[in-house]
Regions:
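Bacterial N-terminal signal peptides that target proteins for export
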Residues: 2-17
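Juxtacatalytic substrate-recognition/specificity segment
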Residues: 37-139, 155, 234-241
């Protein structure tokens, strides 16, 4: 195996043609496509905290990924017990052919310390690996913290962005357009959150609220809330755990968040 390129981008030149990616055709599906029709991605590179798998000619941004990892684990106060497997695909079709799942651009398997992604570096799915070591609340908060952590430490950019837009700017714009889904009691449960058809809006809204909680109450309070929650918590359970962790009702925190967003 030969590596070319600088410290921020590694390219693997796989000697055997048999290790090249086989890409399947077809569009996205709402469910896994069934047994994979292509071989798993080949191992391509390794860094201090990751093992990378990608096709010949593809690349990952190792320096940026390691910088993000170093920042995030300190911020969350976690120790990751093993290297994370980073599986990078060239397209949704490629991902679907190899995993049977083609309805997303990225997903995590925290129990396997594995992420699957189309991106050359990742600051969202890796967060699911880290926070799973702490706890697993409803999807609203679980996705919210991942979005709130979408920063770029290597570039010195610590503003959380989702699909290129700063999350509080997005929340403000959605509110002005009357698009924010309110009150939050409608969507803080997993079923409520997943019931929003516009996932870009739902992720930005959750990310803005959780980023606000981190700013207002501190990361330790947020992590305390994570430790007590489960994915299937009902609304009243979430309300009680929220008040216990933050010393504030969900409704009061929502009002303060909206005042902050403007």
């Amino acid at each position: 195996m030969t590596f070319v390129g600088n410290a921020s981008t590694i390219r693997a030149v796989v000697a055997s043609a048999g290790l090249a990616a086989a890409m399947a055709c077809g569009g996205s599906t709402n469910t896994p496509a069934g047994p994979s029709s292509a071989p798993p991605l080949p191992f391509a590179a390794e860094s201090a905290n990751f093992r990378y798998y990608y096709s010949s000619g593809d690349s990952v941004q190792v320096e940026r990924q390691e910088a993000y990892h170093a920042w995030a684990v300190v911020r969350l106060g976690v120790v990751v017990p093993r290297k994370i497997e980073y599986r990078k695909y060239t397209s949704r079709e490629d991902m679907g052919a190899r995993t049977g799942k083609s309805n997303t651009s990225a997903y995590a398997e925290p129990e396997e310390f594995t992420i699957h992604t189309l991106w050359s570096w990742d600051n969202h799915e890796t967060v699911h690996i880290y926070t799973a070591l702490i706890g697993r609340p409803s999807d609203f908060f679980n996705e919210g913290i991942a979005v709130a952590f979408q920063t770029d430490p290597l570039s010195g950019d610590f503003e959380p962005r989702f699909n290129g837009e700063q999350v509080h700017d997005a929340a403000r714009r959605y509110r002005q357009l009357g698009l924010l889904v309110l009150p939050l009691s409608r969507i803080v449960s997993t079923s409520g959150f997943r019931g929003i058809s516009d996932s870009t809006l739902s992720y930005r809204e959750a990310g803005s609220f959780v980023a606000f909680l981190i700013t207002r109450f501190g990361i330790d309070r947020v992590l305390q809330f994570f430790r007590t929650g489960t994915r299937d918590d009902a609304l009243e359970t979430i309300r009680g755990r929220f008040e216990q962790a933050f010393g504030s009702t969900l409704e009061k925190a929502e009002a303060d968040w909206l005042a902050f967003v403007g």
